[in-house]
């Protein structure tokens, strides 16, 4: 019996350091770290940013929400 859109929506988080700098060329594996999570639209209407571990940068970096 839900009315309208769901409050919790799935979001995709992407490493901002990998996107900005490109991934290290001297490393064996290249790519961009992505996480899938969900957020409550009423509590956090703006873009979500979390500190997560990036396996390509080998450190904790800021992962920002990506538009689908």
Curated annotation (Swiss-Prot):
Concerning SUPFAM superfamilies, the annotation shows: Zn-binding ribosomal proteins
The UniProt entry's coiled-coil ranges are none
Which gene holds the coding sequence for this protein? rpl33
Under the heading NCBIfam families, the entry gives:
PRK00504.1, PRK00595.1, rpmG_bact
The protein, known as: Large ribosomal subunit protein bL33c
- What would be one Pfam family of this protein? Ribosomal_L33
Q: What does the record give under GO molecular function?
A: structural constituent of ribosome
Keyword Chloroplast in the entry? The reply is yes
Biological process annotations from GO: translation
Query: Which is a Gene Ontology cellular component entry for this protein?
Result: ribonucleoprotein complex
Which family is it part of? Answer: Belongs to the bacterial ribosomal protein bL33 family.
Instruction: Tell me the keywords, alphabetical order.
Output: Chloroplast, Plastid, Ribonucleoprotein, Ribosomal protein
Q: Can you say where in the cell this protein is located?
A: Plastid, Chloroplast
């Amino acid at each position: 019996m839900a009315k309208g859109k769901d409050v919790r929506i799935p979001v995709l988080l992407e490493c901002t350091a990998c996107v900005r700098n490109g991934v290290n060329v001297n490393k064996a594996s290249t790519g961009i770290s992505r996480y899938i999570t969900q957020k409550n639209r009423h509590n956090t209407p703006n873009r979500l940013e979390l500190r997560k571990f990036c396996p390509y940068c080998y450190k904790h970096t800021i992962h920002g929400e990506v538009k689908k």
